[in-house]
From Swiss-Prot:
Residues 127-219, 230-324 form the WSC domain. It comes from Homo sapiens. It is a single-pass type II membrane protein. GO terms for molecular function: sulfotransferase activity. This is Sialate:O-sulfotransferase 2. It is found in: Golgi apparatus membrane. Gene3D superfamilies: P-loop containing nucleotide triphosphate hydrolases. Glycans are attached at N189, N242. Belongs to the WSCD family.
Length: 565
């Protein structure tokens, strides 16, 4: 055997060309076998595999980890061909039995996954037809429904899915990171070359351009083609004096229902739907119809002709719902046209709602807010002033949590946002261990982190307010709780201090979308009070100190709900 091997080596040393030829043939044959196994090993998806619920569902934990967590929303229509292929997203990939795995062969799984990815992308394209590149403008949007931004992870599919979920017919992307939805395109198309910006979260894909929208028409599922998301009940209100000016669009509906009126106003792209018996009125919240003086709901308790368990209001008292249409009157934002002559701080203890207040200020003034720090996650969510140096003078105010004398005296004026310390400490703890809108894990609350956090941060809550009251040059105190309760008045005070003319219609627009995407969900709450008796005793003493300091300056003391606990 050794002699045979030696002769074999000597032969190829003398004939190197033959050796490399033989090697190339060997590799080619191996590749063909590999490709063949990939095509032959790809199984068709049976009915039960396409719908795991029908088959009893997959085993727990069988989902493949490499697929990520994006799921195809119910807004898209499931095409007939979809049942014959495996999707990249959702539950169809969960669990494969031993026989199916055997069909894939040793290498077939990897190859067929790549093949399926290509096929599924083609199927996804059938659910959204590309229309073209369109002109867009902050003053006159091409698509006037909801919008959302992500300057880090935006993809075409994500935008389409979000718009389809809300029942919109069109979805468009621009600046590589901004997604807009609408029921009709209200702009002219331009050259395809002008949509030239790559998606932030999808290399090789185009997501519009500078003030240019890449627009897609969405193929909606039958059940969502007339669904426009959940309308928000605003209350019962007296008929406005000048109805045609307050609510400019009206339709008579003999078979009136809440859905019909909401759908009608959504199609007309108005954020308010007002039911008045057999009449449906659409419009915006304005000074003529501000939605501030709610009436007793019994005054609107007239049954709908098409839905006996719904109230449709009367000709004198309207039932009002807020549709999913975004009020764009307060969405335009920009940097200050010239360098500001004064630096105004938006000062707060961490967890007191500073990010939310920035969102409100930007909507109310139309100018970006800045920050003493730099938070990339906030910049990616649309706070474009986050990247500017805090002394640039291009932003309307500056977020800061600082409380030293030197840092405070660097500002010419300040809005001091104060929040209940019990709520603020928990919010900051959640942010520290769960992100801006996330939550700390149960282990963090039960571990040593929480007691140590309270011990270090509770004194800071008091000294932060006391320092700003002592060293601040011109301080406007705003309580977080008052801002939530009476946003129109409190935000108006804040805008006045910033030196911007208060536009009431713009403040009403802010009221309709006050939460934005920067508010932690209230659905997840601790099932117990994390504050021990000793913690409560210490914090109550700090509350009394702050209350006395406020009253000593002829200001309103802390709200009553700060104590007792």
């Amino acid at each position: 055997m050794a002699k045979l091997w030696f002769k074999f080596q000597r032969y190829f040393r003398r004939k190197p060309v033959r050796f490399f030829t033989f090697l190339a043939l060997y590799l080619t044959a191996g590749s063909l076998v590999f490709l063949h196994s990939g095509f032959v090993g790809q199984p068709a998806v049976s009915g039960n595999q396409a719908n795991p619920a029908a088959a009893g569902g997959p085993a727990e934990g069988a989902e493949l980890s490499f697929l990520g967590d994006m799921h195809l929303g119910r807004g898209f229509r499931d095409t007939g061909e979809a049942s014959s292929i495996a999707r990249r997203y959702g539950p169809w990939f969960k669990g494969k039995d031993g026989n199916e795995r055997a069909k894939l062969g040793d290498y077939g799984g990897a190859w067929s996954r790549a093949l399926k990815g290509r096929v599924v992308r083609e199927k996804e394209e059938e659910r959204a037809k590309y229309i073209g590149c369109y002109l867009d403008d902050t003053q006159s949007r091409a698509l006037r429904g909801v919008s959302f931004f992500d300057y880090k992870k935006m993809t075409i599919f994500r935008c389409q899915d979000n718009c389809a979920e809300r029942g919109y017919l069109y979805g468009g992307l621009e600046f590589g990171a901004e997604c807009y939805c609408g029921h009709k395109i209200q702009a002219t198309n331009v050259s395809e070359a002008e949509c030239d910006m790559e998606c932030k979260g999808e290399r090789g894909s185009v997501c519009g351009g500078a003030n240019r929208l890449s627009v897609y028409r969405l193929q909606l599922a039958q059940e969502s083609a007339r669904r426009y998301g959940s309308a928000v009940f605003r209350g019962c209100f007296r008929r406005p004096d000048n109805l045609s000016l307050a609510l400019p669009v009206t339709a008579a509906m003999l078979n009136m229902s809440v859905d019909k009126c909401v759908d009608f106003c959504t199609e007309k792209e108005y954020p308010l739907a007002a039911l008045a018996g057999t009449a449906c009125h659409c419009g915006f919240p304005t000074t003529r119809f501000p939605l501030h003086d709610r009436e007793d709901e019994q005054l609107c308790a007239q049954k709908c002709s098409a839905e006996e368990f719904e109230s449709c209001g009367t000709p004198s008292y309207f039932i009002v719902y807020q549709t999913q249409v975004q009020d764009n009157r307060c969405m335009d934002r920009r940097f200050l046209p010239g360098k500001s002559k004064q630096l105004i701080a938006l000062a707060s203890f961490p967890g007191a709602g500073n990010t939310w207040a920035r969102h409100l200020i930007e909507l109310a003034t139309g100018f970006y807010t800045g920050s003493y720090y730099f938070d990339g996650s906030l910049y990616n969510k649309g706070f474009k002033g986050e990247r500017d140096h805090w002394r640039s003078g291009r932003t309307i105010c500056i977020k800061t949590h600082e409380s030293g004398q030197k840092e405070i005296e660097a500002f010419d004026a300040a809005i001091l946002l104060i929040r209940n310390p019990y709520k603020a400490l928990m919010a900051e703890f959640n942010r520290k261990y769960g992100g801006h809108i996330g939550f700390a894990a149960h282990a963090h609350w039960k571990g040593k982190e929480w007691p140590e956090f309270v011990r270090n941060y509770a004194p800071w809550w008091a000294t932060h307010t006391l320092d700003w009251l002592k060293f601040g040059k011109k301080v406007l105190v705003v309580h977080f709780e008052d801002l939530k309760q009476d946003l129109f008045v409190q935000l108006g005070r804040m805008v006045s201090l910033l030196g911007v003319a208060v536009r009431e219609d713009r403040l009403l627009c802010v009221e309709s979308q006050k939460d934005g995407n920067f508010k932690r969900s209230g659905l997840r709450k601790l099932e117990y009070d994390p504050y021990t008796a000793d913690m409560q005793k210490t914090i109550s003493a700090y509350i009394k100190m702050v209350d006395a300091a406020l009253k000593g300056r002829n200001l309103t003391g802390v709200p009553d709900d700060y104590y007792p606990r």
